[in-house]
Swiss-Prot record:
It holds the Pfam family HH_signal. This is Sonic hedgehog protein. The gene is shh. The C-terminal domain displays an autoproteolysis activity and a cholesterol transferase activity. Both activities result in the cleavage of the full-length protein and covalent attachment of a cholesterol moiety to the C-terminal of the newly generated N-terminal fragment (N-product). The N-product is the active species in both local and long-range signaling, whereas the C-product has no signaling activity. It comes from Devario aequipinnatus (Giant danio). It is found in: Secreted; Cell membrane. One of its GO terms (biological process) is tissue development.
Length: 121
């Protein structure tokens, strides 16, 4: 506690690779499904909106902007209610997020995935 971790070489994730290496809706990855959150539910009030055009992470050494100057994190899907995901999707609870980079350069996605894991997502 209180000690900085030594920087380590970041290895990009492969396409369709998960950390932990289990499907997103398993207990090991995300805990139990707690139920879909709708706009009319009490739990909807617990969701925190973020209208900031820049997403900032508390991460002294490996942010998207440090890794790729001028590139921003682009959130394509967060909490959702449209019914386009599987029935117990974590998007319906506000516990899943789909991300890309502002330049939409797919060659960055493996490293972006690794940065998300290192940031605690």
């Amino acid at each position: 506690y209180g000690r900085r971790r030594h920087p380590k070489k970041l290895t990009p994730l492969a396409y369709k690779q998960f950390i932990p290496n289990v499907a997103e809706k398993t207990l090991g990855a995300s805990g139990r499904y707690e139920g879909k959150i709708t706009r009319n539910s009490e739990r909807f009030k617990e969701l925190t909106p973020n209208y900031n055009p820049d997403i900032i992470f508390k991460d002294e050494e490996n942010t998207v902007m440090n890794h790729w100057p001028g590139v921003k994190l682009r959130v394509t899907e967060g909490w959702d209610e449209d019914g386009h995901h599987f029935e117990e999707s974590l998007h319906y609870e506000g516990r899943a997020v789909d991300i890309t980079t502002s330049d939409r350069d797919k060659s960055k996605y493996g490293t972006l995935s690794r940065l998300a894991v290192e940031a605690g997502f």
